[in-house]
Amino acid sequence: NTVSSFQDILMRMSKMQLGSSSEDLNGMITQFESLKLYRDSLGEAVMRMGDLHSLQSRNGKWREQLSQKFEEIRWLIEEMRHRLKITENSFEQITFMQALQLLLEVEQEIRTFSFQLI
């Protein structure tokens, strides 16, 4: 379940002390939360049976927003890969591996939802 996975990853990331990069980590946590909310809102639009008109009226630039979210995901994936390369701490490695896996799942879910809305 990606909801509990999100909570687990966010909790684990918030426990990490990455020294000078804790600001970066907080930024990543914020982006994770933002992506989760975005994924959930797309899912709700799909649940209302392809409620594209509602989505468009609420946010006329939803395609732009979708593109921006994919950019955020790509950036986070690169950031996770970079962190995996530089960390020696196994707790951090496991956390970043799980976060990376979760990002890939969320990217796929957002892609699936957006295809259903087009």
Curated annotation (Swiss-Prot):
InterPro entries: Flu_NS2. A motif (Nuclear export signal) lies at residues 9-18, 82-91. It is found in: Virion; Host nucleus. One of its GO terms (cellular component) is virion component. Keywords: Host nucleus, Host-virus interaction, Transport, Virion. One of its GO terms (biological process) is exit of virus from host cell nucleus through nuclear pore. Coiled coil: none annotated. Pfam families: Flu_NS2. Belongs to the influenza viruses NEP family. Average number present in a viral particle is estimated to be 130-200 molecules. Binds M1 protein. May interact with human nucleoporin RAB/HRB and exportin XPO1/CRM1. Mediates the nuclear export of encapsidated genomic RNAs (ribonucleoproteins, RNPs). Acts as an adapter between viral RNPs complexes and the nuclear export machinery of the cell. Possesses no intrinsic RNA-binding activity, but includes a C-terminal M1-binding domain. This domain is believed to allow recognition of RNPs to which the M1 protein is bound. This is Nuclear export protein. It comes from Influenza A virus (strain A/Mynah/Haneda-Thai/1976 H3N1). The lineage of its organism: Viruses, Riboviria, Orthornavirae, Negarnaviricota, Polyploviricotina. The gene is NS.
